[in-house]
C-alpha cells in the first residue's frame, strides 16, 4: 500500500481526548484523521461520572447536554468494608452519561466537522522523520505533521516504545484490574457512592435512561486468589461490604457478561514520546476514586490543541510545542494525580478506610478541601 493523503493532525485513539482534539482541530480547518480500533458505538470500562468542570467545554464542542436530561450528581457516599460510612456534598459535582452514548455523539460531531474517522483500524507504529510522521495501520501508511496518542491506559505502542511505566515490575501502583456493569437498582439519582472492599473499591452512580454504572477497581492478586473468576471474587470479597451485598443481591443486571480490563498502572507517564503528544489516560491515569478521569481527558485535549495550533500556525517550533504542552499538563494535572495516588492508599483496606472516615467526618470543610485537590476548575 502507498502513502495515503497527508494530514495536518493524526490522532491514535477515539475516546474523549482523541475526539475532543479532533473536533477542535477540524474546526480550525486542519486536515485531521483519527484511528479507532473499535467501531462506534461501544461500551468501555469507565466510571461514567463527569465532573461539571467539563460541562461548558462539551457544550462548546456541540454536545446538547442541557437537552439530554442527564442526572446531576452533587452528593458523595463513602463506605468502608465493614459498613461505616460518610456522606458529603460534592463541591462542584458532576453528571452521569455512558461512554456508549458520549463517544458516539462526539464521533458524529467530529464527522460533521470533517474529521476522517477510520474505525476498526489498529495503529501498529508511528515513526517520526524529517519533521513529519508516518502512521502505520491496517489501512496502510498515513503521513501527518503532528500526531497525538489518545489510545487509553495501555496500548501496543506503549510496549513497542518501551514506555517507562511498561518496564516497571508489578507493584502497588501498576497491577490493577477494573470491572464494569450497567444495572438497574434503587439508588438516589444525585448520589455517587464509593464502596470499599478488601483491596479495592466500587463506584456506583446514575447515567442516562435511569440506568446505573457500577464499576470497580481491585488488585490482580484479588482476582488470582478467586480462581480468576469475577463472580467468585464478587461473592467472597466485594459482598462482605453490606452496601455492596445489598446492591449485588437486588440489582437487575443489563449485561450478559461484565466488561473487564487488566494491567492498569498509576505510575507516572511521559506526556511526549517520540515527538507524539500524549493526551487523556495515555499521558497519565488518575485514580478512579477521584472521579476526574473523563474531565482530565477533555481538558488535556484542549491544552494539546492550543499548542498544536501555535505550531501549525508557525508561531512555535516542534520543540517549543512539546515543552509548552508538558509544562501545561503538569501545571493543571500534576498535583491532582499526586493527590489521587495519596488518597487511594486509604481505600481498599478496612483499617485505613475506617481511619480516614473517622478522622475527617467531624470536619466537612476538610473533606471538601480533599475533594477539591483531585479536581480542577471549569475550563
Task: List each language-model region with its residue ranges.
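N-terminal Rossmann-like FAD-binding beta1-loop-alpha1 element of flavoenzymes
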Residues: 7-33
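Conserved N-terminal glycine-rich FAD pyrophosphate-binding loop of Rossmann-like flavoproteins
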Residues: 39-59
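A conserved beta-strand/loop capping segment in the N-terminal third of enzymes
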Residues: 54-105
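FAD/FMN-dependent oxidoreductases across multiple families
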Residues: 125, 141, 224, 228-307
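Conserved Rossmann-like nucleotide-cofactor binding loop
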Residues: 17, 40, 154
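C-terminal helical "tail/cap" subdomain of flavin- and related membrane-associated enzymes
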Residues: 306-379
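Predominantly flavin-linked oxidoreductase catalytic cores and closely associated redox partners
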Residues: 109-244
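Glycine-rich FAD pyrophosphate-binding loop
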Residues: 26-46
Amino acid at each position: 500500500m502507498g502513502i495515503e493523503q497527508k494530514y495536518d493532525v493524526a490522532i491514535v485513539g477515539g475516546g474523549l481526548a482523541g475526539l475532543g482534539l479532533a473536533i477542535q482541530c477540524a474546526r480550525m480547518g486542519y486536515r485531521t484523521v483519527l484511528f479507532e480500533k473499535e467501531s462506534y458505538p461501544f461500551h468501555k470500562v469507565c466510571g461514567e461520572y463527569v465532573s461539571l468542570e467539563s460541562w461548558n467545554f462539551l457544550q462548546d464542542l456541540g454536545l446538547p447536554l442541557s437537552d439530554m436530561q442527564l442526572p446531576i450528581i452533587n452528593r458523595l457516599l463513602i463506605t468502608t468494608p465493614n459498613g461505616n460510612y460518610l456522606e458529603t456534598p460534592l463541591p462542584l459535582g458532576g453528571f452521569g452519561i455512558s461512554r456508549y452514548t458520549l463517544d458516539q455523539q462526539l464521533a458524529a460531531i467530529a464527522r460533521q466537522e470533517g474529521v476522517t474517522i477510520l474505525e476498526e483500524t489498529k495503529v501498529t507504529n508511528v515513526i517520526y522523520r524529517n519533521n513529519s510522521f508516518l502512521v502505520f495501520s491496517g489501512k496502510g501508511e498515513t503521513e501527518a505533521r503532528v500526531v497525538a496518542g489518545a489510545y487509553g491506559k495501555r496500548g501496543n505502542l506503549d510496549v513497542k516504545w518501551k514506555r517507562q511505566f511498561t518496564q516497571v515490575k508489578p507493584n502497588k501502583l501498576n497491577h490493577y484490574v477494573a470491572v464494569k456493569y450497567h444495572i438497574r437498582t434503587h439508588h438516589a439519582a444525585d448520589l455517587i457512592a464509593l464502596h470499599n472492599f478488601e483491596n479495592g473499591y466500587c463506584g456506583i452512580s446514575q447515567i442516562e435512561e435511569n440506568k446505573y454504572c457500577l464499576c470497580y477497581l481491585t488488585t490482580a492478586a484479588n482476582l488470582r486468589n478467586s480462581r480468576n473468576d469475577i463472580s467468585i471474587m464478587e461473592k467472597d470479597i466485594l459482598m462482605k461490604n453490606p452496601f455492596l451485598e445489598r446492591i449485588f443481591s437486588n440489582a437487575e443486571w443489563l449485561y450478559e457478561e461484565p466488561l473487564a480490563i487488566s494491567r492498569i498502572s498509576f505510575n507516572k507517564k511521559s506526556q511526549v514520546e517520540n515527538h507524539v503528544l500524549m493526551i487523556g489516560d495515555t499521558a497519565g491515569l488518575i485514580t478512579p476514586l477521584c472521579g476526574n478521569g473523563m474531565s482530565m481527558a477533555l481538558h488535556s485535549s484542549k491544552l494539546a490543541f492550543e499548542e498544536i495550533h501555535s505550531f501549525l500556525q508557525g508561531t512555535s517550533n516542534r520543540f517549543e510545542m512539546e515543552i509548552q504542552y508538558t509544562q501545561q499538563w503538569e501545571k493543571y494535572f500534576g498535583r491532582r494525580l499526586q493527590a489521587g495516588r495519596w488518597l487511594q492508599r486509604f481505600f481498599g483496606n478496612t483499617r485505613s478506610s475506617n481511619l480516614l472516615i473517622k478522622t475527617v467526618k467531624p470536619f466537612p470543610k476538610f473533606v471538601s478541601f480533599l475533594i477539591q485537590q483531585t479536581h480542577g476548575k471549569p475550563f
